[in-house]
């Protein structure tokens, strides 16, 4: 089965989610520590996906849209180049504005505590990034 990988990039952690191209229901995958080494994070992600047997056809990465160039944007561009080299699949950047706030609001609405938010925010934000991407792909 073929999958699309969603990524919520952070300087400390990278949240990931997957959706298969048939069912199209995104679900959280896992969080990867960056530890100041993007190449190692990309290699670990590649290894884990390969071991789990996921065949990727696309990667979608959340990208913050500011009116100025920020350090996080520079880091994401470096990350994208590493991802493209390692995975050899199309990479799409998608606006991630408000994903973390939306995740927090959804968890609070469910009555879950901030501790749950801290543990789940990265993978759930990646899930939202995938949902936004899939919604953009729907024909009008």
Swiss-Prot record:
Cite the CDD domains for this sequence: YqgF (cd16964)
Entry EC number(s) = 3.1.-.-
Does the keyword field hold Hydrolase?
yes
Q: Which UniProt keywords apply?
A: Cytoplasm, Hydrolase, Nuclease, Ribosome biogenesis
Question: What cellular component terms from Gene Ontology apply here?
Answer: cytosol
Query: Where located?
Result: Cytoplasm
Quote the InterPro entries the UniProt record gives.
RNaseH-like_sf, YqgF, YqgF/RNaseH-like_dom, YqgF/RNaseH-like_dom_sf
First-tier enzyme category under EC? hydrolase
One GO biological-process annotation of the entry reads:
rRNA 5'-end processing
For molecular function, the Gene Ontology terms on record are: nuclease activity
Sequence similarity: Belongs to the YqgF nuclease family.
Chain's role: Could be a nuclease involved in processing of the 5'-end of pre-16S rRNA.
Q: Which HAMAP family match?
A: Nuclease_YqgF
The identity of this protein, by name, is: Putative pre-16S rRNA nuclease
Organism of origin? Mycoplasma pneumoniae (strain ATCC 29342 / M129 / Subtype 1)
